[in-house]
């Protein structure tokens, strides 16, 4: 089966680099599915889970807190603001981040504080959702 080169990088490190049969991720206007030979595309990514279907059936999962997606016919590049490998996701930390963001939202004194708190809350909620999706998938295997 045809594959596509996939790179997922954050400001800190390269998270994934390899060949994949399929990539699914949260685009700005909805979920995107990328197959080998996909038409070129550049778009923003919302916070959420990136699923990389590799040969052999072991999918790779990465949580991204937003970023940019570039697709070329033979390559997919995810430039993430922040990225965490699926195996490194921590539900307790994500829940704590959600609580802090909700508290900050309640106490926001300016539009800037409000916007920052809303962004942090959206990221924490997306991370918790990604953790739940990953747990559901792992329980099936």
Swiss-Prot record:
Coiled coil regions in record: none
Main localization of the protein described in the UniProt heading: membrane
Keyword match Cell membrane: yes
GO cellular component term, pick one: proton-transporting ATP synthase complex
UniProt superkingdom: Bacteria
Annotated localization: Cell inner membrane
Gene3D superfamilies reported in the protein's UniProt record: ATP synthase delta/epsilon subunit, C-terminal domain, F0F1 ATP synthase delta/epsilon subunit, N-terminal
UniProt topology in membrane: Peripheral membrane protein
GO molecular function: ATP binding; proton-transporting ATP synthase activity, rotational mechanism
Claim: Cell membrane is one of the keywords in the record: yes
Keywords: ATP synthesis, Cell inner membrane, Cell membrane, CF(1), Hydrogen ion transport, Ion transport, Membrane, Transport
Subunit structure: F-type ATPases have 2 components, CF(1) - the catalytic core - and CF(0) - the membrane proton channel. CF(1) has five subunits: alpha(3), beta(3), gamma(1), delta(1), epsilon(1). CF(0) has three main subunits: a, b and c.
Family per record: Belongs to the ATPase epsilon chain family.
Free-text function comment from the UniProt entry: Produces ATP from ADP in the presence of a proton gradient across the membrane.
Protein name: ATP synthase epsilon chain
Encoding gene per record: atpC
């Amino acid at each position: 089966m045809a594959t596509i080169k996939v790179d997922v990088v954050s400001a800190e490190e390269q998270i994934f680099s390899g060949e994949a049969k399929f990539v699914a991720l949260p685009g700005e206007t909805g979920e995107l599915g990328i197959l080998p030979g996909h038409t070129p595309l550049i778009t923003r990514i919302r916070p959420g889970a990136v699923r990389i279907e590799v040969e052999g059936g072991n999918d790779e999962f990465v949580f991204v807190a937003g970023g940019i997606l570039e697709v070329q016919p033979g390559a997919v590049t995810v430039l993430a603001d922040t990225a965490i490998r699926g195996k490194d996701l921590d539900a307790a930390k994500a829940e704590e981040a959600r609580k802090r963001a909700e508290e900050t939202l309640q106490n926001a004194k300016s539009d800037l504080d409000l916007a920052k708190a809303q962004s942090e809350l959206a990221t924490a909620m997306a991370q918790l959702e990604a953790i739940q999706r990953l747990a559901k998938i792992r329980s099936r295997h």
